[in-house]
Structure formats: C-alpha cells, structure tokens
C-alpha cells in the first residue's frame, strides 16, 4: 500500500480544520439582510476580519463591541453639548440655577429625558468584563428596555442654536447601528436573559 505523501496529508488536514472551523459560521450578508439597515450592517461588521468566521453569537458580540464604541462617543458628545449650552442665556440654563426661566427648565428636562439618560443607559448596557457578561448585559438591555427607548436629542434642539454633533443627530449611524445590533443580538438562540442581580451590569465606566 502506497503511503500518502506528507505534503498531501497536511494539505488535507488543513482543509478539514478550516471546514470544521467554518462549520458554525454564518453568512454576513444574509444575517445583515434581516436588520433594518443591511448596508450599514455589512459595511461596519465586514471591517472586522473575525466576522468572516463568526457564528450567530460571535457576530452579535462584534456588533455589541462596535456599538459600545459608538455609545462612548455619543455619551461624550452629549456631555459636551450640555456643557456648551448651560450658561444663563442658553437653553439648559436651569441646570445652573435659573429656575425662573420655565422654558429653560423644560429644555433641560427634555435633554436629560430624551438624550442624555438614554445614551448613558446604552453605554452602560453594552459593557462587560468578558464576552459572556457583555452579551448577557446587552441581551437583557435589548429585550427589556430598547424597544421602549424614545431617544431623540433633536426633540430638545431649539432653532437657531448650533447644529447637534452628527453622532447624536436624528438618523445618525449610531442610532441606526443600535437597531442593527439589537436585531443581531435577539437572533442568537437561547431565549431571553433573566433579570440580573442588582448592580451586576451597572458599570460601563471603563
């Protein structure tokens, strides 16, 4: 019996290993086609080489990490916006003691309720010390809160004031990609995540 040449043997072994590794991989375009913004989904996720070999959960984790970076940027933009518009002549003056200005108070409360707080919640929910914790935190957030998230920073934007930064403007890539991430996360088999113990996911400051 003729012995198989060593080169052929290792070539076949490599092919088998690659096939096994890719066995659980999902088609990126097909997965993204289920989201509301498939082109954005493909464009963002394909930039990460790991997306080519990722299974459903792996793809969701890549999306979560990307959305987390966007959330940090958005959170900074929100704080910069609040700081830049908080003197006595601008819309968020209630935060600096001008309680007599009813409109300023309304604007300030609106900004907190529809812009600052929801974005902070997203930033914290997309955090985890490891992949498992990050996935559970994001999954619980999307299944419990995101469907009711009425985030709209422009709702409180007064005509004549400087335009909001792109990342927190209506229809921004951050807003769209959060919807993409939600869909990808909720498609991972395994069912809903039970409520976490108090403060288990209350982090996201790193």
Where are each of the predicted segments found?
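Terminal membrane/secretory targeting segments in land-plant proteins
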Residues: 1-26, 204-206
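Folded extracytoplasmic luminal domains of secretory or organellar precursors
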Residues: 22-206
């Amino acid at each position: 019996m003729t012995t198989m040449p060593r080169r052929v043997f290792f070539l076949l072994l490599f092919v088998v290993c690659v096939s096994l590794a890719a066995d659980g991989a999902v088609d990126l375009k097909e997965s993204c086609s289920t989201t509301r913004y498939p082109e954005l989904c493909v464009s963002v996720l394909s930039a990460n080489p790991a997306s080519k070999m990722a299974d459903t959960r792996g793809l969701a984790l890549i999306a979560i990490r990307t959305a987390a970076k966007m959330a940090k940027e958005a959170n900074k933009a929100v704080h910069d916006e609040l700081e830049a518009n908080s003197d006595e002549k601008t819309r968020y003056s209630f935060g600096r003691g001008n309680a007599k200005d009813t409109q300023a108070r309304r604007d300030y409360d609106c900004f907190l309720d529809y812009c600052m707080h929801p974005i902070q919640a997203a930033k914290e929910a997309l955090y985890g010390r490891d992949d498992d914790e990050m996935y559970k935190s994001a999954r619980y957030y999307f299944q419990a809160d995101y469907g009711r998230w009425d985030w709209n920073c422009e709702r409180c934007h007064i005509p004549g004031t400087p335009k909001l930064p792109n990342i927190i403007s209506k229809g921004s890539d951050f807003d769209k990609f959060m919807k993409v991430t939600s869909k990808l996360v909720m498609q991972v088999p395994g069912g809903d995540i039970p409520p976490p113990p108090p403060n288990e996911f209350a982090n996201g400051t790193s």
